[in-house]
Swiss-Prot record:
SUPFAM superfamilies in the cross-refs: Thioredoxin-like (SSF52833)
InterPro entries to which the protein is assigned, alphabetical: SCO1/SenC (IPR003782), Thioredoxin-like_sf (IPR036249)
Keyword Metal-binding among UniProt keywords: yes
Pfam families with a match to the protein in the record: SCO1-SenC
Protein name: SCO2-like protein RP587
Protein's UniProt keywords contain Transferase: no
Amino acid sequence: MKMQSNITKIIIIMSLLIGVGALYVLLSLSTPKKPLAGQFNIYEDKIKIGGPFELIDQNGEIFNSDKLRGHLSLIYFGFTSCPDICPTSLNKITNIVEILHQNKIDIIPVFITVDPKRDTPEVLKEYIKNFHPKFISLTGNEHQIKDVTDKFKVFYARVNSDNDDQNYMIDHSSFTYLIDKNGRYMKHFYLDISAKEIMELFKNE
C-alpha cells in the first residue's frame, strides 16, 4: 500500500510539473503561427531569447559561447538519463546537420545538460558519441546551468523517485534553438521541422 501511495504521489507531482512547464513554455515562446516554407520571420518578434554563456565541454575544458561565433548553431537542452525525447531530438538534429553539411551550410550542434549533478564531462563524452561527431556537449555547476536556461527560457524540474538522490527524472521543455553566426537567436522549433525548411531561412541571407 505504501509503495502504491508513493507511486500515486509521483504521478501527481509529475502531472503538475508538466502542466506548469507547458504553461511556462507557451507564455515564454509563443508567437503567431506562420507558414514554414519560405516565410520564416527569422528574428521572430524580437523575443529576448539567448545570450552569452560559459560552461564546461565534454573534454573538461571551459567553453565560452563566443566560440560559436562565425558558425550557425543548433542548441538543445536535455539530459543523458532521458529515456525518449532527448535521444529522439538529438537523432533528429544529427540528421538535419548531415543534410545541411551536404548542402555546404556550416552548422554546429550543441547539447546542454539540465542535469549537471549526474552529467559530468566524462558522462557527456560517452553519451554524445551516439550522435553527430560534431556535437559539442556542455555541463557546468548549478548556477551556470540556471543562467543559460533562464536566457533560453528553458523549463526544467527534477522529479524525485523513492527519495533516491540518484534515481530521479527531470521534466523539461524540448525545443531546439537556431542561433546565427553572430550569436543571435533566430528560431526555436520542435521535432516537426526538416532540414529543407531550415535551409529556407538562408535564401535571402
